[in-house]
Design a protein with these regions (language model features):
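Glycine-rich FAD cofactor-binding loop and adjacent beta-loop-alpha segment at the N-terminus
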Residues: 4-6, 10-71
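Active-site flanking residues adjacent to catalytic metal/cofactor-binding acidic residues
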Residues: 8, 31, 152, 279, ...
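Conserved N-terminal helical subregion
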Residues: 52-59, 66-162, 170-178
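Conserved FAD-binding catalytic core of PHBH/FMO-like flavoproteins
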Residues: 142, 147-249, 257
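FAD/FMN-dependent oxidoreductases across multiple families
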Residues: 225-311, 316-318
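C-terminal helical "tail/cap" subdomain of flavin- and related membrane-associated enzymes
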Residues: 305-386
Length: 386
């Protein structure tokens, strides 16, 4: 069996690529190691889509419950620095949209279920078939020929290992906590982020539905703060009042707490032969700006554009040029975002008094300079597209 793109990983990005290419008449096959299980209903983990990512989903007919964010306030918890971002500053309806991870994943998986091989995975990629097709071997020993192999299988990408990509990674020494909460507020389209020595604390509205939660919390804490044996729940209970005081709101946790260690990673190259890394398979960053999934969609968009352009050309598709164009468009942009997030993490975790003063004045200063604010918002919203 042959196909244009074999996609390893039936997550959000892998299924999006399959759906987008299928709409454009390009054959795909998704290989997913997990079972085709019933849709998960858990409503805890959320992701934040920028306007461009939402537009990409709208274009392939994906609709899930959303919560709109029109205003974001960023606060230096150790000082008086504040910066406000508003959607009207970039002439958009909203700055971003919050969706439940499972809602989006289930919708995309359902759309692509007929093109997915479940409970299987790639174990070999053979580039020596001919100059156009490669051959992939699956765990069940079946072989498939494909023009491209797209690794969309997450930060521990099996495809990256099979193709011997060179990994770079670093540990932030932090743990992220996420849970949903009920918060009484006058404006359900506002989000807040507080930087302090008790962690980076983000509050965002969550989609309404058959649950009592109104908001989602994403809280990054230093591992040293929980190394004394305290549980995540105990640490949260002891420190939540600090953020309630800063934000002048009562936060009532509604769900269990999910937690995961924070690391970044990237690869020196995104392409090798017929193989390409996309989304979390290629890179991961600190979640403080909520941009991880949006970088994945930007990757997927660029890859799909190049494949569609190559596929629709009158001559035989130049697969090497297609992949090189994708890599040029995305690799440096993703690395810049990773380094930028690392910079902000180090600035806001610093206990140096001079740096504390500089960041305090810096936030307030940027808040008064419209063109700088507009630049940051445009970048985060996906409008600075390559």
């Amino acid at each position: 069996m042959s196909t244009v793109v074999t996609i390893s990983g039936g997550g959000i990005i892998g299924n999006y690529i399959s759906a987008r290419l299928h709409v454009n008449g390009i054959d795909t096959k998704v290989v997913e190691k997990n079972k085709n299980s019933k849709p998960q209903s858990e409503k805890i983990r959320t992701i934040t889509l920028n306007p461009y990512s939402k537009k990409l989903l709208d274009e392939i007919g994906i609709e899930v419950p959303i919560a709109e964010i029109k205003h974001i306030r960023v606060i230096d918890g150790e000082g008086t620095g504040v910066i406000d971002f508003n959607s009207n500053e970039i002439h958009e309806d909203n700055l971003s949209y919050v969706v439940f991870f499972n809602d989006l994943h289930n919708a995309l998986q359902e759309k692509e279920v007929s093109r997915t091989i479940f409970e299987n995975e790639l174990i070999q990629i053979n580039e020596d078939i001919n100059d156009y097709f490669c051959e992939v071997t699956l765990k069940d020993k079946t072989k498939h020929s494909s023009v491209f192999v797209a690794g969309c299988d997450g930060r521990n990408s099996n495809v990256a290992k099979l193709a011997f990509f060179n990994l770079k990674s670093a540990d932030y020494g932090q743990t992220a906590i996420t849970f949903t909460a009920n918060i009484e507020t006058d404006n359900d389209k506002e989000a807040y982020q507080v930087f302090s020595d008790r962690g980076i604390f983000a509050v965002m509205p969550c989609p309404l539905g058959n649950h009592e939660s109104t908001h989602t919390i994403v809280w990054s804490i230093e591992n040293k703060n929980i190394e004394n044996g305290a549980s995540i729940e105990e640490y949260a209970e002891e420190n939540l009042a600090y953020f309630e005081n800063k934000l002048k709101m009562k936060i009532n946790a509604c769900s269990s707490f999910l937690s995961f260690g924070l690391k970044n990673h990237y690869f020196e190259n995104y392409i090798s032969g017929s193989t390409v890394l996309i989304g979390d398979a290629a890179h991961s960053i600190h979640p403080l700006a909520g941009q991880g999934i949006n970088l994945g969609f930007a990757d997927a968009d660029a890859f799909c554009e190049e494949v569609i352009k190559g596929y629709k050309s009158r001559m035989r598709m130049n697969k090497d040029l297609v992949l090189k164009r994708y890599e040029i468009r995305r690799k440096q942009m993703n690395l810049l975002m990773l380094k930028s997030m690392d910079f902000f993490v180090e600035i806001f975790r610093s206990q140096n008094l001079v740096i504390k003063l500089l960041r305090n004045y810096g936030l307030s200063g940027v808040n008064k300079i419209n063109f700088l604010k507009t630049f940051f918002i445009n970048h985060a919203s996906g409008r600075n597209k390559l």
